[in-house]
Amino acid sequence: MKKVVVGLSGGVDSSVSAYLLKEQGYEVIGLFMKNWHDDSVTISDECPWLDDSNDAMMVADKLGIPFQTVDLSEQYKERIVDYMFNEYEKGRTPNPDVLCNREIKFDVFMKIALSLGADYVATGHYCRKAEFEKDGEPIYQLLSGEDNNKDQSYFLCQLTQEQLSKTLFPIGELQKSEVRKIAAEQNLVTAEKKDSQGLCFIGKVRLPDFLQQKLKSKEGVIVEVPAGNDSYLEEDINFKSKIDQLQHLSKKFNYQLTDGKVVGKHQGAHYFTKGQRKGLAVGGTPEPLFVIDTDVIENVIYTGQGKDHPGIYRQGLFIAQDEVHWVRRDLAIDSDEELRIKARIRYRQPLQDATLHQTENGMYVIFDQPQASITEGQFVAWYQNGELLGSGVIS
């Protein structure tokens, strides 16, 4: 009998995953990860991990499976929290959920599970795995979940073949409504529980409060750049080379204070991210202001009016070579090669038609249509036929 450790998070998805695996005849162990101690920055009096841990324990009890808690808060602080602070300080916007899966759930946690004699680790992610042989070697595919509305393959875009080989996704074929129905039929305490929101494992966190622990607030100005700014003019360029053209399509606008007018003050450019609308506290404009860029060195936030402002859009992005990751290493392209794909630059974004261009220094992703708020530090993931092939950090 194969042994599976299920990461029981105290939510309905992992609860039903554990139930399904038990039904399929696996020996199932429930393991709850405690990853956060600091309650000073969570919103309201929620202490999410305590409630979640109790719910996970009750589910394990109901299913008659052994249950343990592991405290990974130290690794979590080192690998996720510190990384987040560093990224925000550099003016990048990290994605804690993608990191959490790569660094914690499918690394630290997986190693603990395997040391307990597990053959597999299972999670409640809405995605699927398939396997086939190529040249005598097994190849593992990471596929979108059947529930289009809930597909979470994006969060797993940094997984490796080794990690996939040891992973099971029991609810990947189901719709969310079916998962809740199973939980209700089995009288699991999590059946009606709301989906968790917020930073992976931390519960509801006020981001500025969270960041203020490490990043000092510092007053700066908010500049509004008019849509008619010269830098948005389309010029006819004769590119000397393909690389020149790729660089042009993916380069960000470089703003100066003289590009617009000062319309307000802020408490730190590193608290803001591209596309953000809330928290600017500037009124009196016909259309709402959106962040189009942040300059953490000069501590300036550049904004534009309305969601169609040209400063929001860009047609391409670049990934440094050491941040290009192929889930399907066998499909990686060589320098000067191209690949037609579909890509997304954030969770739940509908897939966009694009082309990958591999160069010696890294990968360009050029979209057929300009994309809103391409954000440094976030992940772009690329797909073909519902399979996630690879990903990278937007630089």
UniProtKB/Swiss-Prot annotation:
Localization terms from the record: Cytoplasm
Region (Interaction with tRNA): 150-152, 346-347
Alphabetical keyword list: ATP-binding, Cytoplasm, Disulfide bond, Nucleotide-binding, RNA-binding, Transferase, tRNA processing, tRNA-binding
One Pfam family linked to the record: tRNA_Me_trans_C
BP GO annotations: tRNA wobble position uridine thiolation
The keyword Transmembrane helix belongs to this UniProt entry's keyword annotation: no
Active-site residues (renumbered): C100 (nucleophile), C200 (cysteine persulfide intermediate)
UniProt-listed Enzyme Commission number(s): 2.8.1.13
Reaction catalysed by this enzyme: S-sulfanyl-L-cysteinyl-[protein] + uridine(34) in tRNA + AH2 + ATP = 2-thiouridine(34) in tRNA + L-cysteinyl-[protein] + A + AMP + diphosphate + H(+)
InterPro entries recorded: MnmA-like, MnmA-like_C, MnmA-like_central, MnmA-like_central_sf, Rossmann-like_a/b/a_fold
Cystine pairings recorded for this chain: C100-C200
GO cellular component terms attached to this protein's record: cytoplasm
Positions of region (Interaction with target base in tRNA): 95-97
Gene Ontology MF, one: tRNA binding
Site (Interaction with tRNA): H125, Q378
Binding site residues for ATP: G7, L8, S9, G10, G11, V12, D13, S14, M33, G124
Family: Belongs to the MnmA/TRMU family.
Alphabetical list of HAMAP family matching this protein: tRNA_thiouridyl_MnmA
NCBIfam families, alphabetized: PRK00143.1, trmU
Role noted for this protein: Catalyzes the 2-thiolation of uridine at the wobble position (U34) of tRNA, leading to the formation of s(2)U34.
Protein name: tRNA-specific 2-thiouridylase MnmA
